[in-house]
């Protein structure tokens, strides 16, 4: 079965009975603080009230970050990731569909971790839980039965940049540091920060919130995104490092 990176509620509804489709409710609330890391609140309570049938809940902080790491949201080690995927009953050949409630950045972050750790088939539900409900599809309050899998991560080290690679990119014209924070955070004029406002030198600003409609949670069309991308004046030969 082929797959798209973005799927519709109609598509997901038609594939709910497919045992190779594994649905993850990624709802996690990031509450920005004036200084320092955001306060994280689990969305499990929202999940228990009602979720897409068959979905399991995951938390970006507790499940998709390395416990005890020096910095928040550090990509998990292969061993940590293996245990998570085994607990969730996910296999390499499964098609993982992600959705959330309100904050799209949490969902895309989990998409990236799955991708970096070697999962091939990963999609995001366009519009999230809100569009699912608006489209007239049912919710469930039942916890799905899960059979433990035998997962072994294949980490794509080329998808991850450490401090050395990021530092080298500052002066390398073949690399672009792309800042996904809000414009005022990029400029250092407002918003939350980690003790020092501003950005990595020579970064380019493309706020993640420009990628989707803030009201509906749906991604902008390919034509709309192409217009935005052209404004950044990136070259196909350049390597992009996101942060």
Task: Indicate residue ranges for each PLM-predicted region.
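Cytosolic catalytic domains that perform sulfur/thiol-centered chemistry
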Residues: 1-243
């Amino acid at each position: 079965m082929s797959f798209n990176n973005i799927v519709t509620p109609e598509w997901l509804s038609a594939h709910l009975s497919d045992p190779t489709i594994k649905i993850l409710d990624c709802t996690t609330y990031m509450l920005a603080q004036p200084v320092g890391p955001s306060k994280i609140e689990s969305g499990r309570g929202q999940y228990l009230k009602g979720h897409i049938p068959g979905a399991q809940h995951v938390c970006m902080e507790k499940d998709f970050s390395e416990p005890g790491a020096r910095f928040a949201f550090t990509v998990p080690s292969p061993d940590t990731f293996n245990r998570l995927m085994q607990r969730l009953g996910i296999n390499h050949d499964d098609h993982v569909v992600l959705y959330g409630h309100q904050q799209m950045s949490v969902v895309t972050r989990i998409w990236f971790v799955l991708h970096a750790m070697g999962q091939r088939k990963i999609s995001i539900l366009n519009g999230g839980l809100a569009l699912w409900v608006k489209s007239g599809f049912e919710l469930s309050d039942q916890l799905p039965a899960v059979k433990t899998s035998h997962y072994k991560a294949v980490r794509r080290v080329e998808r991850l940049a450490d401090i050395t690679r990021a530092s080298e990119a500052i002066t390398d014209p073949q690399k672009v540091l792309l800042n996904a924070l809000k414009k005022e955070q990029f400029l250092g004029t407002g918003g939350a920060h980690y003790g020092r406002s501003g950005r990595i030198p020579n970064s380019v600003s493309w706020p993640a919130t420009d990628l989707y409609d803030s009201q509906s949670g749906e991604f902008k069309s390919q034509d709309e995104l192409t217009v935005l991308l052209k404004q950044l004046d990136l070259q196909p030969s350049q390597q992009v490092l996101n942060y």
